[in-house]
Curated annotation (Swiss-Prot):
GO cellular component term, pick one: nucleus
Name of the protein described by the UniProt record: Cell pattern formation-associated protein stuA
Function: Transcription factor that regulates asexual reproduction. Binds the StuA-response elements (StRE) with the consensus sequence 5'-(A/T)CGCG(T/A)N(A/C)-3' at the promoters of target genes.
Family statement: Belongs to the EFG1/PHD1/stuA family.
Species per Swiss-Prot/TrEMBL record: Dothistroma septosporum (strain NZE10 / CBS 128990) (Red band needle blight fungus)
Biased composition (Polar residues): 19-28, 238-251, 319-333, 351-364
Induction: Expression is positively regulated by veA.
SUPFAM superfamilies: DNA-binding domain of Mlu1-box binding protein MBP1
Keyword Transcription assigned: yes
DNA-binding residues: 145-166
Keywords, in A-Z order: Conidiation, DNA-binding, Nucleus, Sporulation, Transcription, Transcription regulation
Compositional bias ranges of the Basic and acidic residues kind: 390-399
Length: 577
């Protein structure tokens, strides 16, 4: 009874029949005819009987009258002559059957999504109806006619016939499923929707300002297409623009706040371009990229190590510059010297040749020489201190006193074992041994080649066998050799292997096959030989026994030889077993 109340007020002269005859107020009947309308009011009710539960004439207090009157007013499509009085009814009629698609149906919420059509370079608004997604382009407002007619439940043949007859159409055969089909102009799509009575189902599709209805969970107050398209096209880039100033300026303040002013004033752009996001969980990248920055000012190098340890490897060199060293470094460096006094005393003598050894390998690091003599020099994160750590593992090997000649031996003994052709000029320093080796495993004279001392067959070949590459102990004259396993500290001094503290068996095996990479080692004991078919460069006659022994103990060498070429026995003689 709430809906037709304004119409009852307009026809107030006959209140009792007005409650029953309100559905006829839309006809604009004159006032004298209202008593007569009560006569034929009863026979007209049966056609609306499907809406009610009983057939008797309706009265004001009947419970069925309210839904009946509401439905009858909504279902009467007849035009009226009294336009001023029927303004409310005509507005309700236009809302229920809207042909423009601009007015939302009663109780329907607009649901629009937007995607970027990369192939066409346009934003597409999508509306779903009857399980079909109908898309509309933002640039030219064309609508996918194939999906539009699918919403109406049209057959494929009829749909294709209608779309083929369109003059302006754009056929899309690739891309997502909801974008494939025949695209037609906006007005033609609206005509098809009105003919098929699906305009209300596709309500937000034909709204002119459809971008304002774009569904966004966090911001539903958007009122312009520009904002909607910008949010849809750049959902992440806009956030990056917002957080980029926070990510670029912050590292310049936090990463370099401990440095002196010359570096901060001269190098501000470098942290901006290299470390845009300090909170990304990878701070080591910042330090690695800004690694060359601290040497620009020598006075600022210790500052980086004092506040940010291990951020710059140059910071550990602050101990050399005693004048500019802060308390953190000055307290840290003597701590190494006093914590283990026996090591520092034993290292005082060999420090004279350990520093030239670093000069050979890395000429630019001479200023770090004083640090490397400390037993904990490995923790300075520099390249050379790995060798210092290796020296610490065998401190008592060096007390016996080494000459400069043994330093040269350590340089070249790895080369002699494998690249024998390049060792011709250095052979004198290798063979020169005035004293017999006191090692427990070698009772022979040290002037004999090591391969003859370690091999069960006393052959005179100048090649090293897999048995001889393991313990190179025949040319050491340290008095401590009797109490230890055969190992040489020369390898630890001159080698560039970071695993210098490994046992001597593994250490020598690693050096054994490094110069010959084309024959990878199988177990760490065997090694590939690249000089099988070469004549001895030292001019010594090779024994037949040694050659046959290599054929049996090294299957890799057998596979390396050509099968068609027989391997002749050098220096003649029958093979003895």
């Amino acid at each position: 009874m709430n809906q037709p109340q304004p119409y009852m007020d307009q026809h107030a002269p006959a209140p009792p029949p007005a409650s029953n005859m309100t559905q006829y107020s839309n006809y604009g009947a004159p006032q004298p005819l209202q008593p007569a309308t009560h006569g034929y009011g009863a026979p007209t009710y049966p056609q609306y009987g499907q809406y009610g539960q009983s057939m008797p004439p309706m009265q004001a207090g009947h419970p069925v009258s309210a839904p009946m009157q509401g439905q009858m007013v909504n279902s009467l499509p007849l035009p009226t002559m009294s336009a001023p009085q029927q303004s409310g009814g005509t507005q309700q009629f236009q809302q229920s059957f809207d042909t423009t698609g601009q007015i939302a149906p009663h109780g329907m919420k607009p649901r629009v999504t937007a995607t970027l059509w990369e192939d066409e370079g346009s934003l597409c608004f999508q509306v779903e109806a009857n399980g079909v997604c109908v898309a509309r382009r933002e640039d030219n407002h064309m609508i996918n006619g194939t999906k539009l007619l699918n919403v109406a439940g049209m057959t494929r043949g009829r749909r294709d016939g209608i779309l083929k007859s369109e003059k302006t159409r754009h056929v899309v055969k690739i891309g997502p499923m909801h974008l494939k089909g025949v695209w037609i102009p906006f007005d033609r799509a609206l005509d098809f929707a009105n003919k098929e009575k699906i305009t209300e189902l596709l309500y937000p599709l034909f709204v002119h300002n459809i971008g304002a209805l774009l569904y966004h969970p966090t911001n539903q107050a958007r009122q312009s297409i520009g904002n909607a398209t910008m949010a849809a096209r750049r959902p992440e880039s806009s956030q990056e623009y917002m957080r980029t100033p926070q990510g670029t300026q912050a590292p310049a303040l936090t990463h370099h706040h401990s440095m002196s002013n010359p570096i901060n004033a001269s190098m501000p752009p470098q942290p901006h371009s290299i470390a845009p996001h300090p909170a990304s969980g990878r701070p080591q990248l910042d330090r690695a990229h800004t690694f060359p920055t601290p040497p620009a000012s020598a006075s600022s190098m210790p500052m980086t190590n004092g506040n940010m340890p291990n951020s710059y490897e140059y910071g550990s060199a602050g101990a050399v510059n005693s004048a500019s060293t802060p308390p953190s470094n000055s307290q840290g460096m003597p701590q190494y010297q006093t914590s283990q006094p026996p090591y520092t005393q034993s290292y005082s003598t060999p420090g004279s040749y350990s520093q030239p050894q670093y000069t050979h390998q890395q000429p630019g690091v001479q200023r770090f020489g004083n640090i490397h003599s400390s037993p904990d020099g490995v923790k300075t994160e520099m390249g050379p201190p790995a060798r210092a750590g290796a020296e610490n593992d065998h401190p008592d090997h060096k007390v016996g006193g080494y000459g400069g000649q043994q330093d040269a031996e350590g340089e070249h003994e790895g080369e002699y074992t494998h690249t024998s052709a390049s060792y011709g000029a250095r052979r004198l320093s290798y063979n020169y041994k005035p004293n017999p080796a006191p090692g427990p495993l070698h009772q022979d004279s040290s002037h004999v080649s090591p391969e003859m001392t370690h091999s069960p067959h006393q052959n005179g070949s100048g090649r090293a066998t897999p048995r001889t590459t393991n313990p190179y102990t025949g040319y050491n004259n340290t008095p401590q050799r009797q109490n230890q396993l055969p190992s040489s500290n020369l390898n630890y001094v001159m080698s560039s292997d970071a695993r210098a503290g490994a046992p001597n068996g593994q250490e020598y095996a690693q050096q054994a096959y490094q110069p010959a990479p084309q024959y990878p080692a199988m177990n760490g004991i065997k090694r590939g030989r690249e000089d099988d078919d070469q004549v001895d460069p030292y001019g010594r006659p090779s024994s037949a026994l040694g050659e046959h022994k290599r054929q049996r103990t090294d299957p890799g060498a057998m596979s390396a030889r050509p099968i068609s070429q027989p391997h002749s026995i050098k220096a003649g003689g029958a093979v003895r077993r």
